[in-house]
Design a protein with these regions (language model features):
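Solvent-exposed loop/turn segments at secondary-structure junctions
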Residues: 11, 34-35, 84
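Short, solvent-exposed loop/turn elements at domain surfaces
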Residues: 13-14, 36-40
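Sequence context surrounding c-type heme c attachment/ligation sites in exported
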Residues: 42-294
Length: 294
């Protein structure tokens, strides 16, 4: 659940298709799991449910990004068991959770990032870059949302009609990775962009890997096709290439997505479980790639 608040009398500006938020802006992201009638925490969420009733969900944490005069600051809050109050946890925290699904129970530890770990993703230009939002940007606020009074509007257009943004964007909208009707490659690259591009970009902390997944490079070698690892260590799974066309099970990229080991898994922050839907998508994309690495 994401929210955006802009101080009264202030506006965000669209400059070169990028949103510049005013001082005092607060962006929140609340993490939760759905619950059943018995109060058990469930693994699957109903993505078709656009209006969220938090009373039917187990709330875990809320992360805030606050715009200051010269920078963004991040604040992780953890909710109490009664879900009546959230407490600031600058040093991070851990929450044991039991999830129920059709395949049985899943026990795991939910890790809340500390303040410094927030910058691990939200500083996309290293080493001297500043923290900034990843989701509340012009190219990502393009989903249609059902607002009150039967009003369906793109999120970024709603910011304009509300008076929170100076003008609409002229840029193109990315394909949603969930859109089954869209091109498979476009969906896969969109998924890799939002999951990996904050690090795997020409100026990011993973730039030395030469694996560029933020959409800025279209050469197959930059996407990992037949590219040997630079510093994967044990994360390579004794495989030779990041992506082997037609062979997802021999591709390091998918191996690391499937792993939950701390020194292997990708993304390395922000998850404790394996994202089966994303793995299925990337596996299908790699499986239909033509060519070979021999």
């Amino acid at each position: 659940l994401r929210t955006l608040w802009i101080p009264d009398g202030s506006q965000a500006r669209l400059i070169d298709e990028e949103i510049e938020y005013p001082v005092g802006t607060v962006i929140s992201k609340t993490f939760y799991y759905p619950t059943n009638a018995e109060g058990h925490v469930l693994k699957q969420i109903d993505l078709a449910e656009r209006q969220i009733d938090l009373s039917r969900n187990k709330i875990i944490e809320t992360r805030l990004m606050v715009r200051r005069d010269a920078r963004w600051d991040a604040f992780p809050y953890v909710w109490n068991k009664e879900e009546t109050e959230a407490f600031l946890r600058i040093a991070g925290s851990s929450v044991p959770i039991n999830l129920k699904s059709d395949t049985g129970d899943h026990d795991f530890v939910y890790f809340v990032p500390n303040e410094n770990q927030c910058s691990g993703c939200h500083v996309t230009s290293h080493p001297a870059g500043d923290m900034h939002p990843l989701g509340a940007i012009a190219t990502q606020l393009t989903a249609a949302f059902d607002y009150p009074k039967n009003n369906t509007e793109l999120q970024i257009d709603k910011l304009v009609t509300r008076g929170w943004l100076t003008k609409k964007t002229n840029g193109s909208s990315p394909v949603s990775w969930r859109d089954e009707a869209a091109n498979l490659e476009a969906r896969a690259l969109s998924y890799l962009n939002i999951q990996c591009g904050h690090c795997h970009n020409p100026e990011g902390p993973a730039d030395t890997s030469s694996l560029i997944l933020d959409g800025s490079h279209k050469f197959l070698i930059n996407l990992g096709v037949c590219k040997t690892p630079v510093a994967a260590g044990g994360g390579s799974g004794d495989m030779l290439y990041s992506i082997v066309p037609g062979a997802p099970d021999r591709s390091i990229l998918l191996y690391r997505m499937r792993s939950s080991e701390l020194d292997e898994m990708m993304p390395e922050l922000g998850r404790s479980l394996i994202h089966s839907e994303g793995i299925s998508l990337i596996s299908r994309w790699i499986g239909q790639l033509p060519g070979s690495c021999s």
